[in-house]
């Protein structure tokens, strides 16, 4: 009889890399910097005229973007991503959120911040999150408390921090941008 020996190569376990770096895991989200894109959906790849970016949201996420700025409108009886004029480019919000879900499924140690410039209601927006099976990932930050670390958000499966410039705070997980951060006019 012949005996076959199978040797398995063992390597030391890789440290967690929260948003691409093990150094970020213990950092609170408000102590972290993320790369973001403005009008993230407006890309050549997605057919927007004029585009802000060459690549669409899936490639942006693969390239390290963790902050998405999205403009939403109601068009064709659904929540759409548009850059002002929907006739010059649009994408169903649920499709973009499905891309985000696919990315989070592939990269479970990522946290993404989404900021909406919304011309639709909080309920319409959150319905798209529910349809894309992402609503449970939305983090709701209690006021007057410290922000959690990235690893805490990851372990709690709350890997989406969602803000809105209007109508935020009306639905859990869809937070008011101006309650939580400051912006300048430039």
Task: Please provide the spans of the model-predicted regions.
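Sec-dependent signal peptide recognition
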Residues: 1-7
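Catalytic cores of phosphodiester-bond hydrolases, prominently lipid phosphodiesterases
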Residues: 15-186
């Amino acid at each position: 009889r012949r005996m076959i020996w199978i040797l398995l190569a063992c390597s030391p376990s890789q440290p967690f890399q929260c948003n691409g770096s093990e150094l970020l895991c213990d950092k609170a989200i408000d102590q972290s910097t993320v790369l973001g894109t403005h009008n993230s959906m407006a890309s050549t790849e997605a057919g927007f005229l004029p585009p802000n970016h060459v690549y669409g949201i899936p490639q942006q996420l693969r390239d390290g973007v963790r902050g998405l700025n999205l403009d939403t409108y109601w068009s064709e009886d659904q929540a759409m991503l548009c850059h002002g004029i929907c006739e010059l480019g649009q994408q169903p919000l649920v499709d973009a959120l499905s891309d985000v879900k696919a990315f989070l499924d592939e990269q479970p140690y990522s946290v993404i911040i989404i900021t909406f410039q919304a011309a639709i209601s909080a309920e319409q927006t959150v319905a798209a999150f529910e349809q894309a099976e992402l609503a449970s990932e939305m983090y709701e930050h209690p006021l007057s408390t410290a922000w959690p670390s990235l690893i805490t958000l990851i372990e709690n499966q709350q890997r989406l921090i969602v803000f809105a410039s209007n109508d935020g705070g009306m639905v859990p997980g869809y937070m008011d941008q101006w309650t939580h951060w400051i912006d300048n006019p430039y």
